[in-house]
Amino acid sequence: MKLASIGIILLLPFLALSSTFAQTKQLVLPAGDIYELRVHCGAGSLYIITAEWRDEITVFADIEVEDLSPNDSQAFAKKNVALNIDKKGNRALLKSDLKRTFLHPVDARINLIIEVPKGVDVFIDDGSGPIHIQHFSGHLDIKDDSGLITVEKVVGNVRVADGSGKIIMEDILGNIEVKDGSGSIEVNKIRGDVRVTDGSGRISIQYVDGNVTVMDESGQIDINDITGNVLIRGPGTGELNIERIKGKVVTQN
């Protein structure tokens, strides 16, 4: 399949703070027949929103480098930053990463803001840093090593596989599936089924118009105001509180 690379608009670098060098880049890819965006990113924050008025995918990237002179920071960014977006068939592929130098480690990150057209599904493979997705229309698939994940005001199914870090999901029209190693999970105002597999950490699920399934090893579980059935498999160590369930409640050891 033909691989089309899109050019990068480079804005002037600036010194945000006395010890932080910041450089801003913007990437634009016409959406056309694209129905899926795949994001591979390393250290840094990630914010995604649906921009219904746009017919292209727009990426704003802030590259931050700590404790280097402006000249050294520019040289580091030029040599070690990988930032590009390509079109392959009906998919857009975004890569945002930093090469790590172990002999002389540098504290650096790439913070991303991504605007996508309505109906474009997003698949995320993230290293570390907070992820915030809101006012989004499309399906989401998130694979994350660590960091806070916030998903709110979404129309579409959401799937999250997380190593560690807090997960917040609120006001979603679609089914939810979460697989979490450690960290608390908060799920609120969902119109769809919820399925959670958790290693450790508190789980709070409330106001769900659908069925709820939880598989848990340890940590407190609070479930309330559910219109469908609730199934708890292998409740581990931790308090279990279940209230105001319209369907059946089943616990399996």
What kind of feature is each model-predicted range?
Residues 1, 17-20:
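Low-complexity, intrinsically disordered short segments enriched for Gly/Pro and polybasic residues
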Residues 1-7:
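Positively charged n-region of N-terminal signal peptides that target proteins for export
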Residues 7-16:
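Bacterial N-terminal signal peptides
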Residues 20-126, 132-143, 148-162, 168-179, ...:
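Acidic (Asp/Glu) and glycine-rich low-complexity loops/linkers
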